[in-house]
Amino acid sequence: MESQQLHQNPHSLHGSAAASVTSKEVPSNQDPLAVSASNLPEFDRDSTKVNSQQETTPGTSAVPENHHHVSPQPASVPPPQNGQYQQHGMMTPNKAMASNWAHYQQPSMMTCSHYQTSPAYYQPDPHYPLPQYIPPLSTSSPDPIDSQNQHSEVPQAKTKVRNNVLPPHTLTSEENFSTWVKFYIRFLKNSNLGDIIPNDQGEIKRQMTYEEHAYIYNTFQAFAPFHLLPTWVKQILEINYADILTVLCKSVSKMQTNNQELKDWIALANLEYDGSTSADTFEITVSTIIQRLKENNINVSDRLACQLILKGLSGDFKYLRNQYRTKTNMKLSQLFAEIQLIYDENKIMNLNKPSQYKQHSEYKNVSRTSPNTTNTKVTSRNYHRTNSSKPRAAKAHNIATSSKFSRVNNDHINESTVSSQYLSDDNELSLGQQQKESKPTRTIDSNDELPDHLLIDSGASQTLVRSAHYLHHATPNSEINIVDAQKQDIPINAIGNLHFNFQNGTKTSIKALHTPNIAYDLLSLSELANQNITACFTRNTLERSDGTVLAPIVKHGDFYWLSKKYLIPSHISKLTINNVNKSKSVNKYPYPLIHRMLGHANFRSIQKSLKKNAVTYLKESDIEWSNASTYQCPDCLIGKSTKHRHIKGSRLKYQESYEPFQYLHTDIFGPVHHLPKSAPSYFISFTDEKTRFQWVYPLHDRREESILNVFTSILAFIKNQFNARVLVIQMDRGSEYTNKTLHKFFTNRGITACYTTTADSRAHGVAERLNRTLLNDCRTLLHCSGLPNHLWFSAVEFSTIIRNSLVSPKNDKSARQHAGLAGLDITTILPFGQPVIVNNHNPDSKIHPRGIPGYALHPSRNSYGYIIYLPSLKKTVDTTNYVILQDNQSKLDQFNYDTLTFDDDLNRLTAHNQSFIEQNETEQSYDQNTESDHDYQSEIEINSDPLVNDFSSQSLNPLQLDKEPVQKVRAPKEVDADISEYNILPSTIRSRTPHIINKESTEMGGTIESDTTSPRHSSTFTARNQKRPGSPNDMIDLTSQDRVNYGLENIKTTRLGGTEEPYIQRNSDTNIKYRTTNSTPSIDDRSSNSESTTPIISIETKAVCDNTPSIDTDPPEYRSSDHATPNIMPDKSSKNVTADSILDDLPLPDLTNKSPTDTSDVSKDIPHIHSRQTNSSLGGMDDSNVLTTTKSKKRSLEDNETEIEVSRDTWNNKNMRSLEPPRSKKRINLIAAIKGVKSIKPVRTTLRYDEAITYNKDNKEKDRYVEAYHKEISQLLKMNTWDTNKYYDRNDIDPKKVINSMFIFNKKRDGTHKARFVARGDIQHPDTYDSDMQSNTVHHYALMTSLSIALDNDYYITQLDISSAYLYADIKEELYIRPPPHLGLNDKLLRLRKSLYGLKQSGANWYETIKSYLINCCDMQEVRGWSCVFKNSQVTICLFVDDMILFSKDLNANKKIITTLKKQYDTKIINLGEGDNEIQYDILGLEIKYQRSKYMKLGMEKSLTEKLPKLNVPLNPKGKKLRAPGQPGHYIDQDELEIDEDEYKEKVHEMQKLIGLASYVGYKFRFDLLYYINTLAQHILFPSRQVLDMTYELIQFIWNTRDKQLIWHKSKPVKPTNKLVVISDASYGNQPYYKSQIGNIYLLNGKVIGGKSTKASLTCTSTTEAEIHAVSEAIPLLNNLSHLVQELNKKPIIKGLLTDSRSTISIIKSTNEEKFRNRFFGTKAMRLRDEVSGNNLYVYYIETKMNIADVMTKPLPIKTFKLLTNKWIH
């Protein structure tokens, strides 16, 4: 009834009803894309439910049938120009009326599109608008061939009349067209037009009639306004206005495509694989999906595909997730291979018997029941995947071997490739040894095996037989090992061939193994396939690849069998097969020898080279290959250690098209530092693209001329030797390649210079990999041979020769063979560094030996000789007159190579070379030796001096044959004594002073005994002492032919008190004890704080002591006629700079009233400082006096001896406990605590909003904070901090752009309460700021320097403050913050306009803003290297965020700057600095009292008085004041700390507060406390009771001395120069793990402006090294301060460095570069020497008792502490 009313009154409820029905027609769970002509029934299922609820009777709602309806025939006209459908005739109004078209009319008010003017369009009647439900066409359209009569007679036979159809909704936008089309297609289907809707291929089931065409046309234009159609639809309709079907066809096609894409993505995202299906099927499925997406222009990367696949793996495949988790370069093919590998392994492991063959090559797994059957299978993950291109047969998984074994050559089995075969056994067979033929115990069902047949097995990679009756050419097996699945050995007795003679006369042979321990004779289909024979299980035959039938196969049980009648029996002897032990390899060269001789090349290259005959006179069979593939060379592991492989495929493909020597790759390596000038520091390498031939050329520099000469040489060489022209040279973009000179060179010769792109080193892979390979070889060869580093290029040269001669794994020929050259002659090669004896054809005397020991390097380029290094001459020679030194394995003995004897092998390999001592040599005259035998290949000289330690390793002694750790000290008979003294055996020089420090004498105060075991040595030492003169100069003349050779420091040691002792050298290689009193360490090891109270009585003692001043301005090292001036860097002004001028005005202890020789009086004023080595972090506080050191901390070192090596030798040979590293077992918690100190967060000193206001019970304080809060809000609004015009919804903004904000409250030093609105920059997203921007503030040293200069120059000091400084800087990024709490807008956001405090970029923005203003508006310039220090001709400004300190000689100049600043910023004058009376400042926490022209005092008394009582530390508990911050002799207990977690956190928090405050005080001005603060700061995370007590004592001392100030006085008279001095000191090994404490104090014109105390970053091995480390740390800051002083004050500057280490001064002064080359600290010492000489730095000695830097490195007694600090802080 309801439907009738709707039909009768179409205008009623039109809008609402239609809307409600439409909303029900689109189910939420329906896929909107799954619509096409083929699946419309499913899509329409839900909508029909809606229509069915409003069905009406045919008489009231259905369209009445028109029995007079006649459908016209389609016109026979050509098809339209767009589309395959026939052109329909136009519909006339009469036809439309005759077809009841009035039902489909539309209101006239609808806008008429231009295609409505078509003749086929009939304008609807305005009195009958389109109803809500449209009746469908009464009949379906007939086939075109039907006549009108047929249609009119049986209209109901063609279609079923449907009820009213729900019309589609009107198209509302262009974007919704695809969705609208789906509803429109459903509408047409419901209108009985589904069979004319084209599918995605444009195909339709029948042609439409005119009436149907008009119906579609009119409904389409009625519900799809033209202006809302997509562009592609408009284009179709503009060409043919009625071509609606083309639109529908393309729409369906698009929907199908989108639908398939979605299905593919869903399938790819939901991939699952557990091995239930084959891996190949899974791979094909995934690849098909990816390929289909690729065809739709959707590329799925390998990484994404791998991630989706890995997500769905389960079962045994799940472990691949962890394997690929960290990989960034995942390959899909590699992942499929891994899956296939696991699938095959699981399939093999799950089968216990051969598979059951079925027709059509199908098979299934059938388990076996034989209990004792031996079924072999693969258990390794290196399973070889069968090539899918080959025909696959059914697998019987009873045997399989590794892929290497399956590839064995038919003619010969390479035993090294089959050393480990894995087999499986169901019952874990325990078989006999490999050489014994054991009898297996097995029970085989008679129905299970077919007698006299071979079981055909596709799973076995080798054929196995139980009887040797059919085995031809059998050889006993000695290497092949096969194990079952339980890894039990299964012996293989023999290997041989099976010969087949098939029925058609075809003969073939396959490899087979003989073992009696298997259940069946197994025939491998893999072996048959190698002979082009396959098994056809459809016809049960063996066939050739051409289809020829060879033999039938029989199916018996579950398996297929081949009769043994086709096997040809053999007559082999059992004795031959089982006699394995008697077959031994004889006269074979050991692989390690060949590995060494061929430059430590890898196994595959050597083996392949021998197979290809790339090395002559040596065959593959001549080498013992057992375990060669697994051999690990220690030198290779060390020398070739690398992080990862080079990225493959970086070379472009087109490079492969060049001919040999047309395309070169080149690269430069270097520099190699610390080499003599004659040694090359670089090399340039070239690689030919085609042949991979390599060249290397040495370079001493990278200048254009040097590079050009090399290119000229290589091009000429290639042109003349290979008749080729270089066309392209590939290089990187280094300046040595991109210069104009080389570019012009290439242009003139028509060579293309191919450069890599910017920062793309991977494109230069060929040259980069070559350099890496050569350097790996170089390091390996040098390490193996033990030769010095300056021979590094010889190692590179040797490696190049070898690499050119070997076959690489990727090539079939070596580079020499590619180039057409002969292979490498093995008889011309010696192992790199092989000891040899070279004939000396021109000896100094006829009675001198004619042989010189040397080391073979590489074959000569320019002759048939060999390049040999002669250590005695420091030269390399090109000669053929040498003989190999036997029984010497160079440095290999350290890796237990002693058991390898290669001498006989070397003799056989080099038998073709005749040495100069061969018998036939005697017939030649010695005059026939040409001069070229000793022509210098490279004049490499380390130094002409006879230095003591040219060879730090005992293996470098070419004649050292004894393998014991004790070296021989006598020169060998074969060497001239003169030569050995100067060049080859430095130990002979040591024999003159045969002394050694025994284990009790090092670190433990041992005694020294005279030599009684070596008379010769003893007499030498006695004579030397007897000839000792009374002056140092006489001693110098006695010790050397050339004074420069040895230097002063090699002759004597000078005690700090002025006494001189002979330079006591000792021979570490003789077990000699000797004794004397008060042993004195050498210069290198002298403690910087040692002073003797019991001087040794000697000839020169009194004279020296009497002339020693308090400040030693002329140290004993310089007391010679050649060293009268102690300054290090003499220049034009050095005459005016003396020690007195440097030491003048320094706040040093006043010791002038003490006699320098009266050491006992000195010790009265400066108490003993006990120091000992300890594991304590406060170590160095016990047992010995710093002024009375009678115990040697370390045995004296000889000249040029590497200290770190001495320490290792001592640990290994001397067993000295004092040098052992600290035991960490009992200190594990302490160590962890010390290491974790860096992660300590600062203690919060501010209050949150709830703490300051909401829950604050102090009403007065709360009111002050409220007032501060409103004041801050007002300031923020005044500065337009955020956009107040608009509030943003929190949900509409990207979360990472939202910055959390908060209010923080604190009380300032002046008592005012401060509130600040800040951003939470700690959780700010990295994308919201530029990490490269820097926030700078003035350095404290810059402030102290400026204050010091202001005092000396009577400057006015003005202090300013800029309110809300950060808010003056705009913000560039789009950021939002939450409104302040009082606004109550929790869900709203404000957009920031200014740089709010707390943002990461705010500091940098403010710095750039104020910097720009000061430079542009105030005419200031920032001092280079010192941020926030600005100056002009009159004013200096130090900027610290919003605080400004102005310094000027004229106060008006300061006022002028203030006036300019106030124009832009809210500037407050804190202190103008007027008047001549004392003015007090509070500058950055420092309380400064300043009176112009008189003094300046810096302290923190008020601040400390206020803050210290709030720390809850019991101050003055007993009323006793501490007079020093700490006392020597206190040690921190290292026992584990057992404490509750809550108590631990509480104590750590307390330590943070205490040490934080102490650090602030020490950093500002209390430099005397820095050592104690630094030590306790390392124990913040170890808050034991002892550590807390020591911290309390430090706080107590700060409280007791809170009134102390850093005192500066104006320099009077004013000097024309500024003097900048640093005083340095170090305390050796007094920190955990023998780390040293270093300290430096900086003084400007006598005023202490800064100090530093820290633990050395490196573990020093001697006192000298610690002092050098301290000095090297001080010089960079000294130079920076020098630059600052010169910028702020234009006076000349004198820079000085004071240290109490004479050995350090000696090192700085020395010009000998070789002395420290092999030392651990040699690099730092040589750099220090360069810095001193290059910066005009004056270095002087200062006595320890006057070194005020001592307070920075160790705890001192009260008197000493006061004496060193009372002049500069009191």
Curated annotation (Swiss-Prot):
Active site: residue positions: D457
GO CC terms of this entry: cytoplasm; nucleus
Disulfide bond annotation, renumbered to this chain: none
Biased composition, class Polar residues, residue ranges: 1-11, 19-39, 49-60, 366-390, 399-408, 415-435, 1009-1024, 1065-1082
Keyword Transmembrane helix: no
Motif (Bipartite nuclear localization signal): 1193-1227
EC number: 3.4.23.-, 2.7.7.49, 2.7.7.7, 3.1.26.4
Domain RNase H Ty1/copia-type: 1625-1767
Residues at the site labelled Cleavage: H397, N398, N578, N579, A1232, A1233
Region (Integrase-type zinc finger-like): 579-636
Chain residue ranges for the region called RNA-binding: 295-397
GO MF term list: aspartic-type endopeptidase activity; ATP binding; DNA binding; DNA-directed DNA polymerase activity; RNA binding; RNA-directed DNA polymerase activity; RNA-DNA hybrid ribonuclease activity; zinc ion binding
Positions contributing to Mg(2+) 2 binding: D1361, D1442, D1443
GO biological process: DNA integration; DNA recombination; proteolysis; transposition; viral translational frameshifting
Compartments (UniProt record): Cytoplasm; Nucleus
Domain-related comment: The C-terminal RNA-binding region of CA is sufficient for all its nucleocapsid-like chaperone activities. Integrase core domain contains the D-x(n)-D-x(35)-E motif, named for the phylogenetically conserved glutamic acid and aspartic acid residues and the invariant 35 amino acid spacing between the second and third acidic residues. Each acidic residue of the D,D(35)E motif is independently essential for the 3'-processing and strand transfer activities of purified integrase protein.
Protein name: Transposon Ty2-DR3 Gag-Pol polyprotein
